[in-house]
Amino acid sequence: MTDQTTRLPIRRALISVSDKTGILEFAKELEALGVEILSTGGTFKLLQDNGVSAVEVADYTGFAEMMDGRVKTLHPKIHGGILGRRGIDDAIMNEHGIKPIDLVAVNLYPFEATINKPGCDLPTAIENIDIGGPTMVRSAAKNHKDVAIVVNASDYAGVLESLKAGGLTYAQRFDLMLKAFEHTAAYDGMIANYMGTVNQAAETLSTSGRSEFPRTFNSQFIKAQEMRYGENPHQSAAFYVEAKPAEVGIATATQLQGKELSYNNVADTDAALECVKSFVKPACVIVKHANPCGVAVSPDAEGGIRQAYELAYATDTESAFGGIIAFNRELDAATAKAIVERQFVEVIIAPSVSEEARAIVAAKANVRLLACGQWSAERAAAWDYKRVNGGLLVQSRDIGMISADDLKVVTKRAPTEQEINDLIFAWKVAKYVKSNAIVYAKNRQTIGVGAGQMSRVNSARIAAIKAEHAGLQVAGSVMASDAFFPFRDGLDNAAKVGITAVIQPGGSMRDNEVIAAADEAGIAMVFTGMRHFRH
């Protein structure tokens, strides 16, 4: 059994990196510790130009770099030095003049950055597939009992600290080994994804006609947290995040206080945050079981998120109990005070939190308070995944949204400016409500939300019941539907409760009947041409 605490001293290191962040300082410290350094190409030149003593790999192996750098480190004196088992292979290493290499610091050609450049063609992508680097990484990782492999610049400081204490323990080398295999797995997966989208029949080998979906789907996530249980107590669970999230979200959030996030907390907080990101003016979204139960935009700048919260809460005070609250502005003291004095809340998330607000929420020690950072107005394209038994559904994320200019008026009466504002507000909310989704809204406040019903007209009835229960007046509100109305009964029901304007995608075989129902009731209706199913 390997001793977990015995430290391995480092006498010889091989350094060859594409990303040179921190490498010069790392090499200088290694040199100061008496470590002999082998290096290649641009890394060797950087060290040499900055006074770090190093031996070029070509001089050590006696074999010059060739084929425009394609062959540099693929040599027995390199891989024998990395793979050689101390105490087992010593004689054969000595016979062939192979010196042990105790530490390998390598990161790989920037394949991802290359393929993301506009106009990248297949030959360019191929030249940025690293061969020698992954080979050294895997060799060192395989022989982690005797060799330390460092692929992340973030590990340089910790490695140096350990070397100054006498060397790296087996536990540390094992952790570095795991990071190395994760690194090469992600790299190979990225290459496979890319190559799987290239049109093989393209004579020019251009990648402009690439398929959107690769032949095999490879993606890597990093474990951020193990959870007490999953969606239900009998299920185990963990939260994994992307190495480089495309934009601000639940995966980038910092927890400032409160109990550990649960599986359901993460899912619900994601739903709340993604919804509130849809709004430009100060807004609040309250979510329960992944559905918005109250959403509002502050009617004036002075009201801020405090006023938005009051209006969102008023939509459904019962469902807000134990909910998730998200804001698109910094959480201030007044809003924090209003929340903690009024209701039980699981999670509060905002781009940032004032010190005064933190102090107020601290009085409720169990409340999970998160700051996620400010997001860009531009939504990043990304993939959505849905696991099915034996497979995975993959689609582009629904980042589609419309403006007033995109609306097609299909009724005799056109909506007023106020109705248009409310229609777009309700449409943004409906996008985040489980289908079939119906949202009633007035003055950019949700009046009633009907979610997740098998019948669209029943969702509309539930939205009206919710509004009545909350003491809110449906008459004079607008209605949003995430998909088309298959029959006119949805509009007849809307007329009955006093809806004045409707927004929906359109596209039903009976659109003419639905439009006629709206005209009969004097309801203005617009089509978006875009559906927002959410399952």
UniProtKB/Swiss-Prot annotation:
Name the chemical reaction catalysed here. Answer: (6R)-10-formyltetrahydrofolate + 5-amino-1-(5-phospho-beta-D-ribosyl)imidazole-4-carboxamide = 5-formamido-1-(5-phospho-D-ribosyl)imidazole-4-carboxamide + (6S)-5,6,7,8-tetrahydrofolate; IMP + H2O = 5-formamido-1-(5-phospho-D-ribosyl)imidazole-4-carboxamide
Q: EC number(s) in its UniProt entry?
A: 2.1.2.3, 3.5.4.10
Pathway(s) of this molecule: Purine metabolism; IMP biosynthesis via de novo pathway; 5-formamido-1-(5-phospho-D-ribosyl)imidazole-4-carboxamide from 5-amino-1-(5-phospho-D-ribosyl)imidazole-4-carboxamide (10-formyl THF route): step 1/1; Purine metabolism; IMP biosynthesis via de novo pathway; IMP from 5-formamido-1-(5-phospho-D-ribosyl)imidazole-4-carboxamide: step 1/1
Instruction: List the record's Gene Ontology CC terms alphabetically.
Output: cytosol
InterPro entries given in the database record: AICAR_Tfase_dup_dom_sf, Cytidine_deaminase-like, MGS-like_dom, MGS-like_dom_sf, PurH-like
Q: Which PROSITE patterns match?
A: MGS
Q: Which Pfam families match?
A: AICARFT_IMPCHas, MGS
Q: Which family does it belong to?
A: Belongs to the PurH family.
Per its record, how is this protein called by name?
Bifunctional purine biosynthesis protein PurH
Q: Which gene encodes it?
A: purH
